[in-house]
Design a protein with these regions (language model features):
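Conserved small-residue-rich beta-alpha loop and adjacent elements
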Residues: 42-113, 161-162
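Conserved NAD(P)+-binding/catalytic subdomain of aldehyde/semialdehyde dehydrogenases
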Residues: 63, 126-171
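N-terminal Rossmann-like NAD(P)+-binding subdomain of aldehyde/semialdehyde dehydrogenases
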Residues: 1-55
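Alpha-helical elements of the RecA-like P-loop NTPase motor core of helicases
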Residues: 8, 75, 104, 136, ...
Length: 171
């Protein structure tokens, strides 16, 4: 459990948030995402409508660009990684430059946790020195963009030429 360490680093690095609130969020939100997805089908036939004959099939998309904000630098990347792994996709996290250290630590801790389960080391990546240009390049190179942030970031995701999902104030 690295909730306290990550909370302290996030508050110190970003200058945002209350330490105790960050600890609680780090502990509770990530677990909530996991428990919400546990046992749910995310591959193959996930629904069949006998009446209409329609079959819903889920498959991996490829590489996900996970754009994360400085306001939630731990739980947002962790959640995006959980979603990507559940759907058998690779993910590259592009943290906000003002939260790069704490976000990178969170990503690397997740990599350490999943490695014993056979998850390839490069399936989860993080941009260590993020910038607007690197994030834009990532969005153009990936298969889908999942962006959390303000209006300029979400607009950039929607303008990337890739399928994009925007969440946050810019949505």
């Amino acid at each position: 459990d690295h909730a306290e360490e990550l909370a302290r680093l996030a508050v110190n690095e970003t200058g945002m948030g209350v330490y105790e609130h960050k600890v609680a969020k780090n502990r509770n939100k990530s677990k909530g995402v996991y428990y919400n997805l546990r046992g749910k089908k995310s591959m193959g036939i996930i629904d069949m409508d006998e009446k209409t004959g329609l079959i819903e099939i889920a498959k991996p998309i490829g590489v996900v660009a996970g754009i994360t904000p400085m306001t939630n630098p731990i739980v947002t990347p962790v959640s995006k990684i959980i979603f990507a792994l559940k759907t058998k996709n690779a993910i590259i996290i592009a943290p906000h430059p003002q939260s790069k250290r704490c976000s990178a630590l969170a990503v690397n801790l997740i990599k350490d946790v999943v490695a014993p389960f056979g998850v390839p080391a490069d399936l989860i990546q993080v941009i260590d020195e993020p910038s607007i240009d690197k994030t834009k390049e990532l969005m153009e190179a990936c298969d889908v963009v999942v962006a959390t942030g303000g209006m300029p970031m979400v607009k950039s995701a929607y303008s990337s030429g890739k399928p994009s999902f925007g969440v946050g104030a810019g949505n």
